Amino acid sequence: MIPRHFALLAGAALLTACASSGAPASLTRMGPEAARERARADSLRYPYTKADIDFMSGMIHHHAQAIQIAEWAPSRGASPALIRLTERIINAQTDEIRLMQTWLRDRNLEVPTPNPAGMPMKMNGMDHVMPMPGMLTDAQLRQLDAARGPEFDRLFLTFMIQHHRGAVTMVDTLLASNGAALDETVFKFAADVSVDQTTEIKRMLQMLLEGNTP
């Protein structure tokens, strides 16, 4: 039997193919704003679980740290190749944070403020921050912050590979949760994160192997 999360990720290709074939005729006859409202209303019919909420909320903070360290690249003497990579990361993950915030807002759920340190939570009445899988530790952040030039490039790639692998782990955890990812938006987003970040991991490993040459 194929594990559930592998079967779900395999289905992402079919979902994407169906989406690319065009919107339903009823939507194409509407104006853009009406079509968006109809699509939003349709999406609200899908069930969602606490695992879905935790995933969407947690990934906001996970993405926030990736954006934070990517924004350091220009001022740390990063190579042109690395700066191009960081620009892609910033653009893609900024858009994805908006998607996650919209999903939560549309369901009248709490929309967290992005926190690069991790997910804020209370334990024994005190505020704590829970890091997500793969997120950089304080020591790693200080090490990267102090690095310059080729050393920054090397550390950034090493740490971002770690960070991306953590995101893939979060997707695997979601898809292994009973009843999770039945919501179309959550499923497609999770599948995109897994596929896109796995692809970027391979690219970054190659950049490390080649010494990060443009």
Sequence positions of predicted segments:
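C-terminal motif of bacterial Sec signal peptides marking the signal peptidase cleavage site
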Residues: 15-17
